[in-house]
Amino acid sequence: ISCSLVGSEMCIRDSIYCGDPVFNAIMGETERACREHKIDFQYDLEIPQKLKLDPVAVCSILSNLTRNAVAAAEMTERAEEFLTVKAAVKGDYLHICVENSRTKKAPKKTERKGYGLEILRDLVERNHGQIDIQPGEGSFRVDVTVENF
């Protein structure tokens, strides 16, 4: 399923993004947050059925990725805000790619911020996966691959 959501336009019905109910719940939360903050939200999901991966792991990894991305995109200039989620099951693995706009200046660290990537690395490692982090000039991309068996 592919979709692009700009502003408050919706092109899906009943918040069914893919075949996995946990993924659907997190994507619905992400879509609502993007609409609320006027972030251009796009996704491309190839998940035809319920994942074999532990639902708590799916929830933890995907919600960490998307919440961090929404928070970073919010700090971008209004005309440039975007968030893209791509995910697919290929063989015995789940691949997730989240890319978001980001400000060119690093935000000031606050007391409780800055642990998102550490938490994500731990979650991915515990699920026998790999993570690739690619900070770009005006964007930030995280690719995660975890076992789905």
Feature locations, PLM:
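Conserved short strand/loop->alpha-helix "switch" segment adjacent to the catalytic nucleotide/phosphoryl-transfer site
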Residues: 15, 19, 42-61, 111
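Short beta-to-alpha transition helix within the HATPase_c
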Residues: 19-37
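Short beta-strand/loop element within the Bergerat-fold HATPase_c
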Residues: 80-92
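Glycine-rich/acidic phosphate-handling loop/turn and adjacent ATP-lid/helix
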Residues: 92-121
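Glycine-rich ATP-binding loops of the HATPase_c
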Residues: 128-141
